[in-house]
Protein backbone atom coordinates (compact mmCIF):
# COMPACT_ATOMS: atom_id res chain seq x y z
CA UNK A 1 0.00 0.00 0.00
CA UNK A 2 1.31 3.45 -0.90
CA UNK A 3 2.73 5.87 1.65
CA UNK A 4 0.01 8.37 0.79
CA UNK A 5 -2.70 5.90 1.83
CA UNK A 6 -0.97 5.21 5.17
CA UNK A 7 -0.64 8.95 5.73
CA UNK A 8 -4.34 9.33 4.95
CA UNK A 9 -5.19 6.70 7.56
CA UNK A 10 -2.99 8.49 10.10
CA UNK A 11 -4.79 11.74 9.39
CA UNK A 12 -8.17 10.05 9.87
CA UNK A 13 -7.09 8.77 13.29
CA UNK A 14 -5.52 12.09 14.29
CA UNK A 15 -8.78 13.83 13.46
CA UNK A 16 -10.38 11.58 16.09
CA UNK A 17 -7.46 11.96 18.51
CA UNK A 18 -6.09 15.51 18.11
CA UNK A 19 -4.26 15.23 21.43
CA UNK A 20 -1.58 13.22 19.59
CA UNK A 21 -1.14 15.57 16.63
CA UNK A 22 1.89 17.41 18.01
CA UNK A 23 3.73 14.14 18.70
CA UNK A 24 2.75 12.76 15.30
CA UNK A 25 4.18 15.84 13.59
CA UNK A 26 7.64 14.90 14.91
CA UNK A 27 7.55 11.49 13.18
CA UNK A 28 9.55 11.14 9.98
CA UNK A 29 7.90 10.80 6.59
CA UNK A 30 9.40 7.50 5.44
CA UNK A 31 7.08 4.58 4.82
CA UNK A 32 8.43 2.66 7.82
CA UNK A 33 8.08 5.65 10.14
CA UNK A 34 4.54 6.43 9.02
CA UNK A 35 3.53 2.77 9.31
CA UNK A 36 4.88 2.68 12.86
CA UNK A 37 2.89 5.83 13.61
CA UNK A 38 -0.23 4.13 12.28
CA UNK A 39 0.30 1.15 14.55
CA UNK A 40 0.87 3.46 17.52
CA UNK A 41 -2.32 5.40 16.86
CA UNK A 42 -4.30 2.18 16.45
CA UNK A 43 -2.87 0.92 19.75
CA UNK A 44 -3.89 4.14 21.50
CA UNK A 45 -7.40 4.37 20.08
CA UNK A 46 -10.10 3.61 22.63
CA UNK A 47 -13.13 1.51 21.55
CA UNK A 48 -15.63 3.57 19.56
CA UNK A 49 -17.50 3.23 16.26
CA UNK A 50 -15.29 2.83 13.20
CA UNK A 51 -15.84 4.60 9.89
CA UNK A 52 -16.38 2.40 6.87
CA UNK A 53 -13.80 4.41 4.93
CA UNK A 54 -11.08 3.77 7.51
CA UNK A 55 -12.00 0.10 7.87
CA UNK A 56 -11.76 -0.45 4.12
CA UNK A 57 -8.26 1.03 4.02
CA UNK A 58 -7.18 -0.77 7.18
CA UNK A 59 -8.42 -4.14 5.98
CA UNK A 60 -6.70 -3.72 2.61
CA UNK A 61 -3.41 -2.86 4.35
CA UNK A 62 -3.57 -5.64 6.94
CA UNK A 63 -4.57 -8.22 4.34
CA UNK A 64 -1.58 -7.28 2.19
CA UNK A 65 0.74 -7.45 5.20
CA UNK A 66 -0.70 -10.83 6.17
CA UNK A 67 0.13 -12.24 2.76
CA UNK A 68 3.58 -10.65 2.80
CA UNK A 69 4.41 -12.27 6.16
CA UNK A 70 3.29 -15.63 4.81
CA UNK A 71 0.47 -17.78 6.14
CA UNK A 72 1.31 -21.05 7.90
CA UNK A 73 -1.35 -23.78 7.89
CA UNK A 74 -1.25 -25.45 11.31
CA UNK A 75 -2.70 -28.67 9.90
CA UNK A 76 0.36 -28.98 7.63
CA UNK A 77 2.89 -28.63 10.45
CA UNK A 78 4.82 -31.77 11.38
CA UNK A 79 3.56 -33.52 14.50
CA UNK A 80 5.77 -34.22 17.48
CA UNK A 81 6.84 -37.84 17.85
CA UNK A 82 4.86 -38.38 21.03
CA UNK A 83 1.42 -37.31 19.70
CA UNK A 84 0.12 -36.92 16.15
CA UNK A 85 -2.26 -34.15 17.22
CA UNK A 86 0.42 -31.90 18.74
CA UNK A 87 2.86 -29.65 16.87
CA UNK A 88 5.60 -27.27 18.00
CA UNK A 89 6.24 -24.17 15.91
CA UNK A 90 8.62 -21.26 16.42
CA UNK A 91 7.63 -17.95 14.91
CA UNK A 92 5.06 -15.17 14.74
CA UNK A 93 1.67 -16.42 15.96
CA UNK A 94 -0.11 -13.90 13.72
CA UNK A 95 1.00 -16.00 10.72
CA UNK A 96 -0.85 -19.13 11.84
CA UNK A 97 -3.96 -20.24 9.97
CA UNK A 98 -5.83 -22.08 12.71
CA UNK A 99 -9.40 -22.22 13.86
CA UNK A 100 -8.17 -20.23 16.87
CA UNK A 101 -5.02 -18.70 18.24
CA UNK A 102 -4.75 -17.91 21.94
CA UNK A 103 -4.04 -14.38 23.11
CA UNK A 104 -2.46 -13.78 26.52
CA UNK A 105 -4.66 -10.84 27.50
CA UNK A 106 -4.97 -8.62 30.55
CA UNK A 107 -8.06 -8.33 32.73
CA UNK A 108 -9.47 -5.39 30.75
CA UNK A 109 -9.46 -7.63 27.63
CA UNK A 110 -9.15 -4.61 25.33
CA UNK A 111 -5.67 -5.23 24.00
CA UNK A 112 -2.45 -3.36 24.73
CA UNK A 113 -2.64 0.45 24.68
CA UNK A 114 1.14 0.97 24.83
CA UNK A 115 2.22 2.14 21.34
CA UNK A 116 4.09 -0.59 19.45
CA UNK A 117 4.68 -2.61 22.61
CA UNK A 118 6.38 -5.95 21.98
CA UNK A 119 3.83 -8.10 23.83
CA UNK A 120 1.68 -10.81 22.25
CA UNK A 121 -1.51 -8.87 23.06
CA UNK A 122 -0.29 -5.89 21.05
CA UNK A 123 0.93 -8.05 18.17
CA UNK A 124 -2.38 -9.89 17.82
CA UNK A 125 -4.56 -6.78 18.05
CA UNK A 126 -2.31 -4.87 15.63
CA UNK A 127 -2.51 -7.64 13.02
CA UNK A 128 -6.23 -8.27 13.49
CA UNK A 129 -7.28 -4.64 13.22
CA UNK A 130 -9.38 -2.30 15.30
CA UNK A 131 -12.45 -4.52 14.97
CA UNK A 132 -10.88 -6.86 17.52
CA UNK A 133 -10.82 -4.19 20.22
CA UNK A 134 -14.41 -3.29 19.37
CA UNK A 135 -15.46 -6.93 19.72
CA UNK A 136 -13.64 -7.28 23.03
CA UNK A 137 -15.23 -4.08 24.32
CA UNK A 138 -18.67 -5.43 23.45
CA UNK A 139 -17.94 -8.63 25.38
CA UNK A 140 -16.75 -6.68 28.39
CA UNK A 141 -19.73 -4.35 28.35
CA UNK A 142 -22.09 -7.33 28.53
CA UNK A 143 -19.96 -9.02 31.19
CA UNK A 144 -19.78 -5.92 33.35
CA UNK A 145 -16.55 -6.77 35.19
CA UNK A 146 -12.88 -7.47 34.44
CA UNK A 147 -11.99 -10.87 33.04
CA UNK A 148 -11.03 -13.35 35.72
CA UNK A 149 -7.71 -15.15 35.66
CA UNK A 150 -7.93 -18.62 34.14
CA UNK A 151 -11.10 -18.15 32.08
CA UNK A 152 -11.48 -17.63 28.32
CA UNK A 153 -13.45 -15.56 25.81
CA UNK A 154 -13.67 -15.92 22.03
CA UNK A 155 -13.91 -13.41 19.19
CA UNK A 156 -13.52 -13.46 15.44
CA UNK A 157 -10.00 -13.18 14.02
CA UNK A 158 -10.78 -10.38 11.54
CA UNK A 159 -7.61 -9.71 9.50
CA UNK A 160 -5.66 -12.57 11.03
CA UNK A 161 -5.31 -15.85 9.12
CA UNK A 162 -6.81 -17.48 12.22
CA UNK A 163 -10.61 -17.66 12.20
CA UNK A 164 -10.91 -16.83 15.89
CA UNK A 165 -8.95 -15.45 18.81
CA UNK A 166 -9.40 -17.01 22.25
CA UNK A 167 -8.45 -14.53 24.96
CA UNK A 168 -7.28 -15.72 28.37
CA UNK A 169 -5.80 -13.90 31.35
CA UNK A 170 -2.89 -15.72 32.93
CA UNK A 171 -1.54 -15.30 36.45
CA UNK A 172 0.90 -12.51 37.28
CA UNK A 173 3.93 -13.77 39.19
CA UNK A 174 5.47 -10.90 41.14
CA UNK A 175 7.37 -12.96 43.70
CA UNK A 176 7.76 -16.65 44.39
CA UNK A 177 5.78 -19.07 42.24
CA UNK A 178 2.86 -20.52 44.22
CA UNK A 179 0.42 -23.40 43.85
CA UNK A 180 -2.27 -20.81 43.13
CA UNK A 181 -0.28 -19.47 40.19
CA UNK A 182 0.12 -23.01 38.86
CA UNK A 183 -3.59 -23.76 39.23
CA UNK A 184 -4.56 -20.52 37.50
CA UNK A 185 -2.29 -21.20 34.54
CA UNK A 186 -3.60 -24.75 34.23
CA UNK A 187 -7.12 -23.28 34.21
CA UNK A 188 -6.15 -21.01 31.30
CA UNK A 189 -5.25 -24.01 29.14
CA UNK A 190 -8.31 -26.02 30.16
CA UNK A 191 -10.64 -23.07 29.57
CA UNK A 192 -9.24 -22.40 26.10
CA UNK A 193 -9.41 -26.05 25.06
CA UNK A 194 -12.93 -26.48 26.44
CA UNK A 195 -14.15 -23.34 24.67
CA UNK A 196 -12.58 -24.47 21.39
CA UNK A 197 -14.24 -27.87 21.67
CA UNK A 198 -17.61 -26.30 22.56
CA UNK A 199 -17.42 -24.14 19.42
CA UNK A 200 -16.54 -27.11 17.23
CA UNK A 201 -13.04 -25.86 16.43
CA UNK A 202 -10.56 -28.40 15.10
CA UNK A 203 -7.28 -26.55 15.63
CA UNK A 204 -5.89 -24.21 18.27
CA UNK A 205 -2.48 -22.57 18.68
CA UNK A 206 -1.23 -21.54 22.11
CA UNK A 207 1.26 -18.82 22.86
CA UNK A 208 3.38 -19.19 26.01
CA UNK A 209 0.76 -17.80 28.41
CA UNK A 210 2.05 -15.60 31.26
CA UNK A 211 5.76 -16.11 30.54
CA UNK A 212 6.33 -12.62 29.12
CA UNK A 213 5.00 -9.53 30.87
CA UNK A 214 3.47 -11.66 33.65
CA UNK A 215 6.82 -13.32 34.58
CA UNK A 216 5.72 -16.94 35.03
CA UNK A 217 8.88 -19.11 34.95
CA UNK A 218 9.20 -20.55 31.45
CA UNK A 219 10.01 -24.17 32.27
CA UNK A 220 7.26 -24.46 34.88
CA UNK A 221 4.75 -22.86 32.51
CA UNK A 222 5.65 -25.25 29.70
CA UNK A 223 5.28 -28.27 31.97
CA UNK A 224 1.78 -27.14 32.91
CA UNK A 225 0.87 -26.41 29.28
CA UNK A 226 1.99 -29.80 28.01
CA UNK A 227 0.36 -31.65 30.89
CA UNK A 228 -3.00 -29.92 30.45
CA UNK A 229 -3.05 -30.36 26.67
CA UNK A 230 -2.14 -34.04 26.86
CA UNK A 231 -4.73 -34.64 29.56
CA UNK A 232 -7.43 -32.88 27.53
CA UNK A 233 -6.62 -34.79 24.37
CA UNK A 234 -7.02 -38.11 26.19
CA UNK A 235 -10.63 -37.11 26.91
CA UNK A 236 -11.54 -35.20 23.74
CA UNK A 237 -11.26 -36.34 20.14
CA UNK A 238 -12.82 -33.31 18.42
CA UNK A 239 -9.67 -31.17 18.41
CA UNK A 240 -7.34 -32.48 15.74
CA UNK A 241 -4.38 -30.13 16.11
CA UNK A 242 -2.88 -28.28 19.08
CA UNK A 243 0.13 -26.10 18.35
CA UNK A 244 2.56 -24.86 20.96
CA UNK A 245 3.78 -21.62 19.43
CA UNK A 246 7.08 -20.30 20.78
CA UNK A 247 9.07 -17.25 19.84
CA UNK A 248 12.35 -17.63 21.73
CA UNK A 249 14.94 -20.38 21.33
CA UNK A 250 14.81 -20.96 25.09
CA UNK A 251 11.12 -21.83 24.90
CA UNK A 252 11.62 -24.06 21.87
CA UNK A 253 14.29 -26.03 23.70
CA UNK A 254 12.06 -26.49 26.75
CA UNK A 255 9.11 -27.72 24.68
CA UNK A 256 11.28 -30.01 22.57
CA UNK A 257 12.47 -31.70 25.75
CA UNK A 258 8.96 -32.03 27.19
CA UNK A 259 7.44 -33.31 23.95
CA UNK A 260 10.17 -35.81 23.05
Language-model features and meaning:
Residues 1-260:
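Macrodomain-like recognition of ADP-ribose-binding/processing modules
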Amino acid sequence: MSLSIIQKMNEMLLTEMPEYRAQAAEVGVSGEQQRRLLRALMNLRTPRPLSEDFLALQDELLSAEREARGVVDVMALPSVASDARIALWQGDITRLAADAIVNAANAALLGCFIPCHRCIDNAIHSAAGLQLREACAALMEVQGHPEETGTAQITEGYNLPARHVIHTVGPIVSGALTDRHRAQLASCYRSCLSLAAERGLRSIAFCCISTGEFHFPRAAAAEIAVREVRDFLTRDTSIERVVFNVFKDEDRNIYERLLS
